[in-house]
């Protein structure tokens, strides 16, 4: 069953401006080390950061909190499976919020889709609860 759904869209040019003005502070406050390494090695780093920013916003919406109630930007990490598929790893308050949404005897699966088409970056998140066993 679907227990959370979120989407977000951001103007890549907004992220480009922030990276020029507040690069280090913005990156350290918002993105995990894994996200930073992935984005810094991307040919168009502003595109990579914008997609990950949109994914974090979409996930926060799917959790029903937004970036509030103790959920921090870095509690929502965008990671890749061994096959390269993007997904989300939650920690701290984001993980606690997810556990509150889960029915008993269910496990959560987070589905993520990210895309960009200049000047837009967009992400969709579906949180699914599946019965154990």
Curated annotation (Swiss-Prot):
Its main location: cytoplasm. Pfam families: ACPS. It catalyses: apo-[ACP] + CoA = holo-[ACP] + adenosine 3',5'-bisphosphate + H(+). Its EC number is 2.7.8.7. One of its GO terms (molecular function) is magnesium ion binding. One of its GO terms (cellular component) is cytoplasm. Keywords: Cytoplasm, Fatty acid biosynthesis, Fatty acid metabolism, Lipid biosynthesis, Lipid metabolism, Magnesium, Metal-binding, Transferase. GO terms for biological process: fatty acid biosynthetic process. The keyword Cytoplasm applies. The keyword Methyltransferase does not apply. Its cofactor is Mg(2+). InterPro entries: 4-PPantetheinyl_Trfase_dom (IPR008278), 4-PPantetheinyl_Trfase_dom_sf (IPR037143), ACPS (IPR002582), Ppantetheine-prot_Trfase_dom (IPR004568). It is found in: Cytoplasm. Mg(2+) binds at residues 8, 57. It is an enzyme of class 2 (transferase). Belongs to the P-Pant transferase superfamily. AcpS family. Transfers the 4'-phosphopantetheine moiety from coenzyme A to a Ser of acyl-carrier-protein. This is Holo-[acyl-carrier-protein] synthase. The lineage of its organism: Bacteria, Pseudomonadati, Pseudomonadota, Alphaproteobacteria, Hyphomicrobiales. The gene is acpS.
């Amino acid at each position: 069953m679907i227990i959370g759904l979120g989407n977000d869209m951001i103007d890549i040019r907004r992220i480009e401006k922030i990276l020029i003005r507040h690069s280090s502070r913005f990156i350290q406050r918002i993105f995990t080390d894994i996200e930073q390494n992935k984005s810094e090695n991307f040919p168009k780093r502003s595109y990579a950061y914008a997609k990950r920013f949109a994914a974090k916003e979409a996930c926060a919406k799917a959790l029903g909190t937004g970036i509030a109630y103790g959920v921090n930007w870095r509690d929502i990490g965008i990671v890749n499976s061994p096959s390269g598929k993007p997904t989300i790893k939650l920690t701290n308050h984001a993980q606690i919020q997810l556990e509150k949404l889960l029915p008993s005897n269910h496990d959560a699966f987070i589905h993520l889709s990210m895309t960009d088409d200049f000047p837009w970056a967009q992400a969709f998140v579906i949180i699914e609860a599946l019965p154990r066993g």
